[in-house]
Amino acid sequence: MMRPRLPGALSLALAAALLSAAAVLAGPPPTETRPATDDLHGVKLMDPYRWLEGSDAPEIAAPDPALDARVAAWTDAQNAYSRRILDGLTGRDLLAERLAELEEVGTIEAPTVRGGGAGGDLYFYRERRGEQAQAVLYVRRGLEGESRVLVDPVEVDASGLTTIAWYEPSRDGKLLAFGLYRGGDELATLYLLRVADGEWLAEEISGKVRGVFWLPDGSAFFYRRLAEVENPYSAQIRFHRVGRHHRHDPVVFEQYKEGPLATTWGPVALTDHEARWLALMYHTGTDSNDLWVYDVERFVTTGELEEIEIVRGENATFTPLVIGDALYLHTTLDAPNGRVVAVDPARPAREHWREILPERDKAVLEGVSHARGRLAAHYLVDAATRIELFDLEGRPLGAVDLPGLGSARLTTEPERDEAFLTFQSFHQPASIYRVDLGSGERTLWARPEVPVDPTLFTVRQVFYASKDGTQVPMFLVYRKDLELDGGNPTILSGYGGFSVSQTPRFSSRNVPWLEAGGVIAVANLRGGGEYGEAWHRSGMLERKQNVFDDFIAAAEWLVASRYTDVAHLGVAGGSNGGLLTGAALVQRPDLFSAVFCAVPLLDMLRYQYFLMARFWVPEYGSAEDPEHL
């Protein structure tokens, strides 16, 4: 049996240091205050730290270098203070060594399969081997064929700062479209290469490109890009013919510029395997979207778009899956846990819809894919995955066998019985299995060799009562020999927003903490998608306080159940989870001894003025609207 790599006493000393390090030094550098007053619907509000917005503040018409320099100096001083604390932590070097060992473990993704002609199918996949700085895109002919490098980011850029953002082979596997992030940015540039010899073609399309959908003959594709890379509201869907300069690419759809739909997220377009229909969606938040379809062949031959409206103005989501001439819609309309209906674009009125997979009370339908006349339905049951197969009329064909309780994704192809299952849990890294959907046989295809003994740990799911009595699930991960003595160092995390579900996932960064005797707790808060759209909506807009109450109740349960105490309890969250931990700290500073608040939204009166945040107004509301206060 593998032993913990960090000595227990040293590790617990490190945990104690992490939870009390703020007391080592005097407080952080003082922050200058400058008067700023807002009149918010008749209420006067003071904001003495407004100046820290710098030139990004909407009131500032032109860049102010002097102001930005003061903001940078403040940031540098705060970072220097943090570094003095973090660099002085007991056992930090040993922890860094163990983390480096774990990070050296490679990663691999499930392959994308394309027909390769007489020579056999082509399997495209990304893999980062232990010594590689970035994942490399490989192709092999046949499942057991020899792998060949197609794109190595380090060969493109020796600095190691270039990564593969996405890739999409043509249907026949002859051409490959892929995106590269360069210099650490997230503005993917599209390139094309010929798979047979790896030669890059002339195409180079910039503008945060993603969402490539090929025509079946590989002659052209649709793609999404930003017309202005600094403007997240400038999205376009364009059409590109291979070999033609992209300046000639027609704009098929674009972001709404004004009016009530200007805050919708879109356009989002996709096509099916046969490119029969082009589906167009505009989203309002994460809980509703409109949907149209267009005849692809007509557009390609005439340049004309004949619009067929499928649904518009409903407070529900509609995700299309095109199979032949039919649309299979995964929707929350009249089904907050999700269902599937079949729609004939020739008769799109709702009275002609056919229900294929009805809503379930105890399971949330997360998505559905097509595999040679089968529907593969991904369900979430108490925040863990279940995958079931159905024929195209909704008749059950059985469940896909999973290795255990965890998170799973089945990658399917419309014309194949072969699929690939990616499975992971809190203490087991992502493994990939080949699944024969005809026989149900599952065989291991790839598993990273991680220097961790998963048998040391246990995963437990508990349910606790929130402030209003709502039962909330929480996962706990810890060593099997843990004693409930009320003093175990514990990290509690959560998210609670945008219908994002917190399912069991492996993180190498948690391993040293667990090996040392620490506890990882993940709360499945309202606002997430663990129990469908009703669960999401109970944690958004005017009900956002439910999320904070759920999180605080989780911390109280951990203390009351003697997993930990206040002196050994830390909380962590990022983005919307950063808002969560920030609110928890403000509302219950007595309950935690450490808070990791990463890239948070904390100024909820003004967040909507920055970057792409106006897309989040349907989730959070806006202080500009008195009804949202």
Question: Where is each model-derived feature located?
Answer:
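Bacterial N-terminal signal peptides
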Residues: 9-22
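Peripheral, non-catalytic segments that deliver or gate enzyme domains
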Residues: 44-45, 50-51, 55-90, 94-149, ...
